[in-house]
Amino acid sequence: MMILLTLFVAGCQPKSEKTALSPQDSLMLAKVNDFAVVTLTTDLGKLTEKEKQMIPLLIEVADIIDNLYWLQTLGDKTAFLDSIKDTITRQFAEINYGPWERLNGNKPFVEGYGEKPAGANFYPADMTKEEFEKWNDPNKTSQYTLILRADDRSLKAVWYHEAYKDQITRAADLLNKAAGFAEDAGLKKYLELRAEAFLTDDYFASDMAWMDMKTNTIDFVIGPIENYEDELFGYKTSYEGVVLAKDQEWSKRLAKFASLLPELQKNLPVDPKYKKEKPGTDSDLNAYDVIYVTGQANKGSKTIAINLPNDEKVQLAKGSRRLQLKNAMKAKFDKILLPISEVLIDSGQRANIKFDAFFSNVMFHEVAHGLGIKNTITGKGNVREALKEKYSSFEEAKADILGLYMTTRLIEMGEIKDITVEDCFITYMAGLFRSVRFGAASAHGKANMMCYNYFEDKGAFERLPEGTYRVNMDKIRTAMNEWAAKVLMIEGDGDYQGAVTYLDANGKIRESLQADLDRLKTARIPVDIVYDQGPKVLGLN
């Protein structure tokens, strides 16, 4: 699916007639090459014949969902891409799912486009916040409705399954067909219920079935799931599709950690009133090869771990599933994090940067989404509703810092034996440099910047004269605990105004850091990865 444009551009010209790229083309080519190409494969020998037959059907569903995400974020994919005559710019637009550079503050790079609409394509372009808030409709804040203009120019809410009826019906049919190949009873039930959910926009039963599913090898994360794209209110969810194959050996290594979640919740570094909720005991941790990705999960920066479902009712009843995407994680570690450490981490601490520490930090980031608090202690409803469009940034900040906290705790408890606390902190610091390059446009980017700036202000690290950074082991633990408490309190109090004020002041990249991030660009270290994927790549012709 993805091509190496450096080879493409060079290969298209006769040797005697090679011409220099224009400055604009050179800029676009550099931006495309900021994404290292990673081929998505898995060991087909570990799959049954029926599982191999099922995967192309799941990929077909994921492709339908990909087109729906384009509609949600911008509009018709084909019409937009056809309007871009330059091949290199079109390739970059495909990576970004539109004309805005996701990892550079959503700056437009296609002529004719201005600032990215905060409400994406979920709301009318001319709708104001005030108009929406005054409008009385019980479905307006649903995760699964589009807000459109009626013939009389008033607002109306339209369910996703109605707005996208033809595509949704086709996707549901394919899910039922895929269920026919499922040998695992749990997977079969989940796929059938997910098909039904597509047609009703009621995902509760299928989320519960997904959590009950334990012995499957193939997994499929599919549907309107995350609300990152809606930066106007944070209500609307975007479609995505992720096809996965479980790594059974690594998953066995992780299974023991799920039983420790209640104990970890009790020991969070915050006042007891913010940790009274008990996480579900049915939570599980598994490692996977990601083998196909579309929609929201494929735009810009690629996810390396997943924590679902988001439904608080399901989480309290069943816990949540943390999916560690091991092949994607290893690719980012090798192609991005290690090269960054050679430029920015003190040479005396580079030996502490280890994949197992990176894996643990990321894994417990996902675990941390299920910890803390889901419902405010101030009577303001659940945290997601109370913090509105700031929720995603603070939820990611919570997961980041509690993930670090839990990894260090488990090392000290003797539950994690192959890495040290020093490995954990120093690898986390290197990981922060990797993450802040996402920019401050996304929820993850804002979360990373708040953490980085808090650590800097507390002296958790220092910048050495030669331009590298050294972690202060005495101060970073205190900074970690204090930042964790601050985030948990903002969430637990449902302190929307506090969230707005803090994020505005601390969610930006400071000049001193930007200068060092620019050095990574000079060193031509990739910003992220892009996938070469599909049935042929997998060997499923």
Where are these regions (language model features)?
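C-terminal motif of bacterial Sec signal peptides marking the signal peptidase cleavage site
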Residues: 7-11
